């Protein structure tokens, strides 16, 4: 089946060229309200766009062998994660039991005796084990869970259980697009409210500019996310091909709203997601964070309490920007921060919090523990 987002590639470059010329003229005329294009930023966005096209093909081959119930190494992955979790739990217990105040930063502060020496030795071993084992348990569990979820919730797989066939007519097409839009709203919202999913999505928010090239700055690690499955549409009677069409329509719509060249659009702002609404979504201004998650329709945000108008000038990017245009850094910085936080944790509530709770919680927890903040913040 033809991927509409790939067919549109020539149009992407044509419209980016037109936008570049338009914003350049405005800036040369003294209008600093638009940021326009910057070479390294644009190249980074294009590189991430290419990566997002290649990643699904590569990940499918890489992850298939370790998918539980499907790959030869799936069982080994699960056993490794469970074993690492057991080691981590044991190390946590040792660290709690040996926390007697006779060490400061690993340096003895009391005279040695046999019992103290045994405790110190056990504590040193536990410290060496708890980080690597915790990371192995969490990473292995995430890979096992996400690969299993992805393979069991595809549109083609769920289509086998459908009870009706809505066909491919105009009503079915419109229905599929609207249903996809509704599911997209929740998936997009969850990507901002769970740090595990935010680590995937943060790529799209990492630019400090806002133009059509930003729309192409897409994640490459979707394979490690567990989302509300759009395959559910197949259970409702939408054919898998129609579900894919709905995906393409939604993604194409989102392309044109990544621009500063278009102002507010009157009454359309009440129903549709517009450039103005989506500029808010990309803002790091406190009142703009985690707002306007809709794809085509803004009504979901109005209904579920996440709507915000564009009232003041938007500051694009993250609350703490990564200061890098390197694609690898853009793609992995938040994952690296999560694993580092897990490695430095000594209890499961903290580990799970750093992975699954919101990005803001991680900042609060670091502050409570008087630790440095992660490299990149929320958007």
Spans of features found by a protein language model:
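Membrane-interface helix-loop junction between the first two transmembrane segments
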Residues: 17-43
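Membrane-embedded catalytic scaffold of the fatty acid hydroxylase/desaturase
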Residues: 56, 87-88, 92-100, 104, ...
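Hydrophobic alpha-helical transmembrane segments
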Residues: 5-9, 46, 78, 170-175, ...
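Long, highly hydrophobic alpha-helical transmembrane signal-anchor segments
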Residues: 57-68, 135-168
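Alpha-helical transmembrane segments of multi-pass membrane proteins
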Residues: 10-25, 56, 60
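Alpha-helical transmembrane segments in multi-pass membrane proteins
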Residues: 37-56, 69-79, 119-139
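Hydrophobic core of alpha-helical transmembrane segments in multi-pass integral membrane proteins
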Residues: 13-17, 54, 79-92, 135-148
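Cytosolic-facing loops and C-terminal tails of multi-pass membrane proteins
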Residues: 313-379
